[in-house]
Amino acid sequence: MSGRGKGAGKARAKAKSRSARAGLQFPVGRVHRFLRKGNYAQRVGAGAPVYLAAVLEYLAAEILELAGNAARDNKKTRIIPRHLQLAVRNDEELNKLLSGVTIAQGGVLPNIQAVLLPKKTSKASK
């Protein structure tokens, strides 16, 4: 015996990413690296990149859900920038969050002022 103790025959556990531990799709390690390299603070806590990755994943999922609905309403199976624009601008909270953002190839929301619409003519009853 070479003095390795009781756990000599046990293999090391399979490595599990921080994204997998947190149950996220977005990369926690990459977010952590960006936080460190971006000079936002001298030190970055262990929970900060997990929280930020979760927030980013939630926002992406929310926008994609609404854009998918917009694509389906237009009888399309592929999301294009127009669908993203319609999704963001028709949602009050996302519109406020992304008010300063221009979506390339997004177009504008269809909107006709009420004054410009033709007047309703009612038939005079006798």
From Swiss-Prot:
Q: Which cysteines are joined by disulfide bonds?
A: none
For this chain, the family text in UniProt reads: Belongs to the histone H2A family.
Subunit field text: The nucleosome is a histone octamer containing two molecules each of H2A, H2B, H3 and H4 assembled in one H3-H4 heterotetramer and two H2A-H2B heterodimers. The octamer wraps approximately 147 bp of DNA.
Which post-translational modifications are recorded for this protein?
Answer: Monoubiquitination of Lys-120 gives a specific tag for epigenetic transcriptional repression. Phosphorylation of Ser-2 directly represses transcription.
Where can this protein be found? Nucleus; Chromosome
* Disordered, as annotated region: 1-20
The cross-link described as Glycyl lysine isopeptide (Lys-Gly) (interchain with G-Cter in ubiquitin) comes at 120
Q: Does the keyword rRNA-binding apply?
A: no
* Start-end of Basic residues biased regions: 7-19
Positions of post-translational Phosphoserine modification: 2
Question: Could you name the Gene Ontology cellular component terms for this entry?
Answer: nucleosome; nucleus
Predominant location = nucleus
- Which keywords accompany this UniProt record? Acetylation, Chromosome, DNA-binding, Isopeptide bond, Methylation, Nucleosome core, Nucleus, Phosphoprotein, Ubl conjugation
* GO MF, any single term: protein heterodimerization activity
Name of the protein this chain belongs to: Late histone H2A.L3
Example GO BP: heterochromatin formation
TM helices/strands, residue ranges: none
Pfam families the record matches: Histone, Histone_H2A_C
| Positions of modified residues (N5-methylglutamine) | 105
